[in-house]
């Protein structure tokens, strides 16, 4: 399970202007996101994304590029990953929202991980902390050592 932050950070290199003093950390995170997606693809590991993740990717990628490229990105995500409809997640996502008060889109990613007992890769520290509270196995990409995680990926 990957959060949209992983997809976006894999696709777009950090900008010196936007990243400022955190540029080196953001560049390392970008490289980790690219490497993670390559590993998942090379190993044929199914990656689940809630349908609403497509909307989040569309919004963020349009801000970073343009709507035409953003649409291409969304189409590629829809063909590369398994899209999970909200109907399969709504009850669990609602429980998570009621207990955690987290952003709405996040609840769908958390629901997939929790329902399917699969780990979540994210670069969203808030989502990672919710995972810790809920005992969802997760990794924060800015701190990850992929070599130590690779044996866990099945």
Predicted regions and their residues:
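Short, well-structured N-terminal submotif of metal-dependent ribonuclease cores
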Residues: 1-49, 62-68, 149
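Alpha-helical elements of the RecA-like P-loop NTPase motor core of helicases
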Residues: 9, 59, 128-129
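Helix-adjacent hinge/juxtasegments
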Residues: 62-72, 78-84
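Acidic, PIN/NYN-like endoribonuclease modules and their adjacent C-terminal/linker elements
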Residues: 23, 82, 114-115, 119-154
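Active-site neighborhoods of divalent-metal-dependent phosphate/nucleic-acid chemistry enzymes
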Residues: 82-126
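Structured helix-beta-strand junction loops
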Residues: 42-44, 79-80, 116
């Amino acid at each position: 399970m990957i959060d949209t932050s992983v997809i976006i950070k894999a696709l777009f290199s950090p900008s010196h202007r936007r990243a400022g003093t955190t540029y080196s950390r953001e560049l390392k995170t970008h490289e980790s996101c690219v490497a993670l997606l390559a590993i998942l693809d090379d190993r044929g590991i199914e990656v689940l994304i809630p349908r609403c993740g497509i909307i989040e990717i569309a919004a963020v990628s349009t801000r970073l590029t343009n709507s035409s490229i953003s649409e291409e990105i969304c189409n590629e995500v829809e063909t590369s990953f398994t899209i999970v409809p909200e109907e399969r997640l709504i009850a669990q996502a609602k429980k998570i929202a009621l207990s955690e008060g987290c952003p709405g889109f996040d609840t769908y990613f958390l629901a997939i991980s929790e329902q399917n007992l699969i780990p979540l890769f994210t670069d969203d520290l808030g989502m990672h902390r919710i995972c810790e509270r809920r005992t969802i196995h997760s990794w924060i990409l800015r701190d990850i050592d992929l070599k130590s995680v690779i044996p866990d990926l099945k």
